[in-house]
Curated annotation (Swiss-Prot):
Protein name: Pyridoxine 5'-phosphate synthase
GO cellular component, one term: cytosol
Organism: Pelagibacter ubique (strain HTCC1062)
Reactions catalysed, as given in the entry: 3-amino-2-oxopropyl phosphate + 1-deoxy-D-xylulose 5-phosphate = pyridoxine 5'-phosphate + phosphate + 2 H2O + H(+)
EC annotation from Swiss-Prot or TrEMBL: 2.6.99.2
Site annotation Transition state stabilizer: residues: E151
Summary of the function given for this chain in its UniProt record: Catalyzes the complicated ring closure reaction between the two acyclic compounds 1-deoxy-D-xylulose-5-phosphate (DXP) and 3-amino-2-oxopropyl phosphate (1-amino-acetone-3-phosphate or AAP) to form pyridoxine 5'-phosphate (PNP) and inorganic phosphate.
Gene Ontology MF: a single term: pyridoxine 5'-phosphate synthase activity
Record-listed 1-deoxy-D-xylulose 5-phosphate binding positions: D9, H10, R45, H50, T100
Residues annotated as catalytic: H43, E70, H192
Keyword Thylakoid: no
């Protein structure tokens, strides 16, 4: 059974647009789980553009919500994650001017730092994932760093599919990375830019155990509601 994680960052984006308390990410997080999602993903960015520290505290504190907290390599953010003890953390690259995460981590450049961070989370029994581009070298490095999981960046294949361009090579990259990850004992997740069609295509890769989807689900739910949107994704991923 493949799992579905729902990123609710843009619930916070809507709230922050009016500087108010509504919609409340914590309330939506609980609703997402009731609607059938396995987990909730939130990204505490350094600039706090959507999710705030108080959101992290409330969501991580709830035992009814399996929380995947996305964080950068920033010490302040790492300390907040350690204090609040989510079920998972996913280390992602972060640039202040980007609209959304633009690519995977540079594991070679940040190897020593990432390994020490993973060690901190492992000691607290917090599972650690690395957000990486689909290449075999990074899968091998993730194993060296003692990461529990990797989340493969699916932005490129998503764009190719949406533009009706050939995506065969990118699909094979993701498939080979997924196979190697499982062979090395690493759990493989996928996320970024996913919609119904792209998720349907990638769900054929049996080694991928989890899809993390945010923007499309939040947007689609404005028309069809969270329950129906989440149900459709669960049906797609487990055909």
């Amino acid at each position: 059974m493949k799992r579905l994680g729902v990123n609710i960052d843009h619930v916070a984006t809507v709230r922050n647009a009016r500087g108010s308390f509504h919609p409340d990410p914590f309330t939506i997080a609980k609703h997402v789980i009731k609607c059938g999602a396995h987990s909730v993903t939130i990204h505490l960015r350094e600039d706090r553009r959507h999710i705030k520290d108080s959101d992290v505290v409330k969501i991580c504190k709830s035992r009814k919500i399996i929380t995947n907290l996305e964080i950068s390599l920033n010490k302040e953010i790492i300390d907040i994650a350690l204090k609040n003890r989510p079920n998972f953390i996913c280390i992602v690259p972060e640039k202040r001017k980007e609209v959304t995460t633009e690519g995977g981590l540079n594991l070679i450049k940040n190897k020593k730092k990432i390994k020490s961070i993973i060690s901190l989370f492992n000691k607290k029994s917090i599972r650690t994932s690395l957000f990486i581009d689909p290449n075999l070298k990074d899968i091998k490095i993730a194993k060296e760093l003692n990461a529990t999981c990797v989340e493969l960046h699916t932005g490129k294949i998503s764009n190719l599919i949406k533009e009706n361009k050939s995506y065969k090579n990118e699909y094979l990259k993701i498939k080979k990375c997924s196979e190697l990850g499982v062979k090395l004992g690493i759990e493989v997740h996928a996320g970024h830019g996913l919609d119904y069609k792209t998720t349907s295509i990638l769900s054929k890769i049996k080694e991928i155990t989890e899809f993390n989807i945010g923007h499309f689900i939040i947007g689609e739910s404005l028309t069809h509601g969270l329950k129906k949107t989440i149900t459709i994704f669960k049906e797609i991923t487990n055909k």
